[in-house]
Regions:
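Short beta-strand segments
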Residues: 26, 74-80, 103-106, 159
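Short, basic/hydrophobic alpha-helical segments
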Residues: 56-75
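RNase H-like two-metal-ion nuclease catalytic core shared by retroviral integrases
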Residues: 79-80, 87, 103-125, 135-137
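Short glycine-/polar-rich loops that comprise or flank the Walker A/P-loop
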Residues: 19-21, 72, 98-101
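Extended, low-complexity cationic-aromatic segments
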Residues: 1-61, 162, 166
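Short, aromatic/basic amphipathic alpha-helical patches
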Residues: 86-96
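RNase H-like polynucleotidyl transferase catalytic core
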Residues: 5-15, 94-114
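C-terminal anion-handling pockets and recognition modules
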Residues: 115-168
Length: 168
């Protein structure tokens, strides 16, 4: 923007600017099978009583959905997000130890987390969006995540980028 000398330009925008889009995801690998990615998206508009983001129940539901669709046990490698360490989440993990094993990544190691690569792909796409409202951002995020789900080569790239998984 520009303005006259000595006058600060003011850009008027629509909306309150008090919304956000939160994402949670699982990047899945099984030797001999194609890589998979599961996700959950939540929109927060600032309404009374509305959750501000993804909660432990959303993560629980995402894990259960992945377990059902994958049809087998899950070894989960997680970062140290506070929600991952919450007491109800730890209880859920303990109650489902027959199909769920969890390892924590070291602190401050996003380079070891393949899901960070997925988020980078989404943000690179959505970052260039001039959205009119929060709903448009949410739709763009969901659309990009759906595209990534159908591109196992992108998921593979995020997995091999961590060097935690190698082919052969």
């Amino acid at each position: 923007s520009w303005g006259r000398k000595g006058c600060t330009p003011v850009v008027r925008v629509r909306g309150r600017g008090s919304g956000r889009v939160s994402m949670a995801g699982l990047t899945c690998y099984k030797p001999g099978n194609r890589s998979r990615m599961f996700y959950s998206v939540r929109e927060y508009r600032g309404r009374k009583g509305e959750p501000k983001g993804i909660g432990w129940r959303d993560l629980r539901d995402l894990l259960v959905r992945a377990h059902i669709q994958l049809g087998g046990p899950i070894v989960l490698v997680w970062d140290n997000l506070r929600m991952h360490l919450a007491e109800p989440m730890r209880e859920f993990i303990a109650d489902h130890a027959d199909w769920l094993t969890v390892f924590q990544l070291p602190s401050y190691s996003p380079d070891l987390n393949p899901q960070e690569g997925i988020w980078s792909l989404v943000k690179r796409d959505v970052g260039n969006l001039a959205a009119a409202d929060l709903g448009q951002i949410t739709r763009a995020v969901r659309r990009r995540l759906k595209q990534i789900q159908y591109r196992p080569d992108l998921v593979d790239g995020c997995l091999t980028g961590t060097r935690l998984i190698t082919d052969g």
